[in-house]
Amino acid sequence: MARTTPIERYRNIGIMAHIDAGKTTTTERILFYTGVSHKIGEVHEGTAVMDWMAQEQERGITITSAATTCFWKGMDGQRAEHRINIIDTPGHVDFTIEVERSLRVLDGAMAVFCAVGGVQPQSETVWRQANKYKVPRIAFVNKMDRQGANFKRVVDQIATKLRGNPVPVQLPIGEEDHFSGVIDLMKMKSINWDDALQGTRFTEEDIPPALQADAEAARHFMVEAIADADEDVMMKYLEGEEISIAELQAALRKATISGAVVPVLCGSAFKNKGVQAALDAVLDYLPSPVDIKPVEGTNPDNGEEIVRFADDSEPFSALAFKIATDPFVGQLTFFRVYSGVLTAGSTVLNPGRNQKERIGRVLQMHANERHEIKEVLAGDIAAAVGLKTAYTGDTLCDLNKPIALEQMEFPEPVIHVAVEPKTKADQEKMGIALGKLAQEDPSFRVRTDQESGQTIISGMGELHLEIIVDRMKREFGVEATVGAPQVAYRETIRKTVESEGKFVRQSGGRGQYGHVWLRLEPLEPGSGFVFENGVVGGTVPKEFINPTEKGVEEALENGIIAGFPVVDVKVTIFDGSYHDVDSSEAAFKIAGSMGFKAGAAKANPVLLEPIFAVEVVTPEEYMGDIIGDINSRRGMMQGMEDEAGAKLIRCEVPLAEMFGYATTVRSLSQGRATYTMQFEKYMEVPGHVAEAIVKKSQR
């Protein structure tokens, strides 16, 4: 099948934002204007096309990032047709993992900001994630029609809070109730959309005289910013020569793709104004798959570095970025094709698991509608049905030209709850349901508690686990009773020690003998566990090093003080001895475990707890009560700011003290304060609190 759209006219973009910035409404308008959906879906009516899970329509928030393909010929309908693949990403902090995995496979993003709320805590998180993956972006300041809308303030916040380099390419005509359209600073024209036709038609007119001076100043700023990023434009600018719109747009495109500049647009998605021009900006300023550097990976056979270009003639390579269970076709694996072509019915390699996979059917998704296609090409985003071994973050590639793309990193869960099915008959169904949900979501874990036999589920926050339990009921028909949330404590050591682990057992016949000397050292927070072999002269043979490490790992899992996993520790085996007959892998595994436990007990072991960054926005009159309450929760104040007629309080609070905070903050402020919280770091638990936790764990 020949390509209908050249790859240069592809745009793989994400829409990223804070929870109430109007991101899903913006996506709905994009789908409407590009002709995919004929009736606009409204979030507040629960009909939005992208929010296709029942819980999303009830809660009005986007949980899973649905992938959608649409086509655009420009606002005036005169351009060559471009293909835009959009990933809608959730804005709630418990779902940052969804955002992270979407950004990994995108080429560009549209960051949506609320003209009233501006840069919110979640905007900062998502922006940092986009920086990590070097995703070029444009900004769309939405909700310009709302009370309190202020375009300039949001632009300033993008510069100060996000440390971006925002360059407005539009100005709003009016704000709040008076918002009627935008000024295009490239053409120096005002654009007005026809309300009666839901914004599908527009007129270009002269700039209103009252705004002419502002527009000229803003254009001057825009041209200077572009000149700063582009030598050719700078030369013309300094010489006082005329710079054409085409030259300015080409230079701004280059600066956006390099990450030097963020073009800023504005509008009101709800009022059908501005999204059409933002789509033009996606074409003008965001990269196609060939504008960004080719994808890099390694040869799984020899570790050599390999590069794959975004070209149909290259060997096939793709990254699975999401697993979803569809009620009609079963398991769907969403993947982004970086190079080559994949045909339905062909077999590919999953190098990370060394498994071959047959691709049954390939589907292109429009929210939760599916269209079966015969093949996917470089730059495409699609979903495959029936893959057995692929998990989120796995590479899929050509059998004969293998490549392993860089793995995705997923955060460790910070909160646990015990779940039990309401009826014994549901026990097995619950196991299957949780297994499927864990395969879809790498930040969600399931395990069985060895002592109590309870099923423990872990995730990134209370809402995350609530939605998992809700999905079990809706999608798998399993009702569960949920225990009180438990904090995921960790343990670590504070000083370097050396310790001996010796396991000798003699009871007639062959004995057991394992003997090791270990050095335990504390590591920087977030380093995890490192094991090194420092044995010289063969005092411990090579075949017993691995079992020793396994023994240490088992001891790590069971903790030192209160049974919580030990982190940020380096263990080096540097000496020991063995017996020709009696030594075995099992004996060295036990010796490793004994050596670690003995050493850790002497190495100043401490408890660590997850600390959350909390931001509360409250009317000033409730500030004293809210700060007092934060202090009573062992909170540490980080600062305060004025925020649109209210106060923004920034603090860090242990997760253990935050359960039920939503109710408290509502009652303290008569429902007028709002808060967000997200995991920040692990810190040592104060002595008196640690004692209580240890006592509780020993019961």
Curated annotation (Swiss-Prot):
Protein biosynthesis recorded as keyword: yes
Single Gene Ontology BP annotation: ribosome disassembly
Subcellular compartments: Cytoplasm
Database matches in SMART domains: EFG_C (SM00838), EFG_IV (SM00889)
Membrane spanning residue stretches: none
Molecular function, one GO term: GTPase activity
Cross-referenced InterPro entries: EF-G-like_DII, EFG_II, EFG_III, EFG_III/V, EFG_IV, EFG_V, EFG_V-like, G_TR_CS
Keywords on record: Cytoplasm, Elongation factor, GTP-binding, Nucleotide-binding, Protein biosynthesis
Span of domain tr-type G: 8-290
Gene Ontology, cellular component aspect: cytoplasm
Domain of life: Bacteria
Binding sites annotated in the UniProt record for GTP: 17-24, 88-92, 142-145
PANTHER family: RIBOSOME-RELEASING FACTOR 2, MITOCHONDRIAL (PTHR43261:SF1), TRANSLATION ELONGATION FACTOR G-RELATED (PTHR43261)
Family classification: Belongs to the TRAFAC class translation factor GTPase superfamily. Classic translation factor GTPase family. EF-G/EF-2 subfamily.
Role description: Catalyzes the GTP-dependent ribosomal translocation step during translation elongation. During this step, the ribosome changes from the pre-translocational (PRE) to the post-translocational (POST) state as the newly formed A-site-bound peptidyl-tRNA and P-site-bound deacylated tRNA move to the P and E sites, respectively. Catalyzes the coordinated movement of the two tRNA molecules, the mRNA and conformational changes in the ribosome.
Annotated NCBIfam families: EF-G (TIGR00484), PRK12740.1-5 (NF009381), small_GTP (TIGR00231)
Protein name listed in UniProt: Elongation factor G
Protein source organism: Acidithiobacillus ferrooxidans (strain ATCC 23270 / DSM 14882 / CIP 104768 / NCIMB 8455)
Gene (UniProt): fusA
